[in-house]
Amino acid sequence: MFDIIIIGSGPAGLSAAIYAKRANLNVAVAEKEYEGTGQIAESGNVNNYLGFPNINGYDLGEKFREHAVSLDVEFIEKEAVQIEAVQNGEKEESVIYRVKFDDDTIAEARALIYTAGAYPRKAGVPGEDEYTGKGVSYCAICDGAFYKGKTAAVLGGGDTALDDALYLSDICEKVYLVHR
């Protein structure tokens, strides 16, 4: 039994794992398949992470993973398909978390941290994948500085699109807001 199972191996999951290991806890990180460390792996140049100026997002994610590996964090390379909280004893707040994986194996822990992350809603336009990280971006705050003094377009239909367009209007020469 683990003290903590962390589902997701992006920056949040690996950070949680590092802190848990430093606290001498028995921790495992479950990841469906290793494709870099979350969304950051798809970022081009990352220039806003302290201590690593102008690093490629994939390389920065690799440094996160190397840090976790150096502390002997255990990785479970399987997809978590079911999570169940099971009563453990008489106290209502005392539970054990059972995580079932895609190969029907089960791991148990006293605590569970879910950091599976998010994926951007892509537009599906030609060239989008080819230019991701090379002009196509999904985070105005993360990547806005790359467009300083340039013309930019924000594609979206909700509050985030408007917030991003307003944020970029202080950085960019001109900003177009394209409503989906």
Where are these regions (language model features)?
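Rossmann-like dinucleotide/flavin-binding elements
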Residues: 1-2, 6-32, 132, 138-180
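FAD-binding core/adjacent interface of flavoenzyme oxidoreductases
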Residues: 1-7, 23, 35, 42, ...
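Short amphipathic alpha-helical segments
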Residues: 17-18, 41-42, 124-127, 165-167
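Conserved N-terminal glycine-rich FAD pyrophosphate-binding loop of Rossmann-like flavoproteins
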Residues: 33-57
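Helical element adjacent to the flavin cofactor pocket in flavoenzyme catalytic cores
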Residues: 58-75
